[in-house]
């Protein structure tokens, strides 16, 4: 017996509405963060760079500085500030190492790990050097 038209396939994965909403919020926050960085003179080199180590939300360059930016969207900027955990920092650092290996032309740049905090009805807060590779 075959499934009728429109019936879900056995291997199809359906995302929960909460996950879909979180994904859309994340994309929106990353777009706001990228626009903010561009307005501040950065050039966006990559967005959502994925590796086995983790994901970098934004890789941005300004002059000889390379910023790996983690974007956090929460109900308040304070909540967002606490959302970058030490474990996540290590995953971002690992992903940054992979990015640098695949983009050796940037190896001599100054490196910085930033956080961009996003909350409704607030300007983004850019935390320069939110963490470093020694943490």
From Swiss-Prot:
SUPFAM superfamilies associated with the record: Restriction endonuclease-like
Transmembrane segments annotated in the record for this chain: none
InterPro entries: Restrct_endonuc-II-like, tRNA_endonuc-like_dom_sf, UPF0102_YraN-like
UniProt-recorded Gene Ontology molecular function terms: nucleic acid binding
Tree of life domain: Bacteria
Family recorded in the similarity comment: Belongs to the UPF0102 family.
Protein name: UPF0102 protein Nham_0146
Organism listed in the record: Nitrobacter hamburgensis (strain DSM 10229 / NCIMB 13809 / X14)
């Amino acid at each position: 017996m075959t499934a009728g038209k429109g019936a879900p396939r056995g291997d199809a994965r359906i995302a929960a509405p909460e996950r879909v909403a979180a994904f859309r919020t994340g994309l929106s926050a990353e777009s706001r963060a990228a626009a903010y960085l561009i307005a501040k003179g950065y050039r966006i080199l990559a967005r959502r760079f994925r590796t086995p180590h983790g994901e970098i939300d934004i890789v941005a360059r300004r002059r000889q500085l390379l910023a790996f930016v983690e974007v956090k969207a929460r109900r308040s900027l304070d909540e967002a500030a606490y959302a970058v955990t030490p474990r996540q920092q290590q995953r971002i650092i690992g992903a940054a190492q992979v990015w640098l290996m695949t983009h050796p032309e940037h190896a001599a740049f100054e490196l910085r790990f930033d956080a961009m905090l996003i909350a409704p009805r607030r300007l983004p807060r850019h935390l320069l050097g939110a963490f470093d590779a020694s943490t």
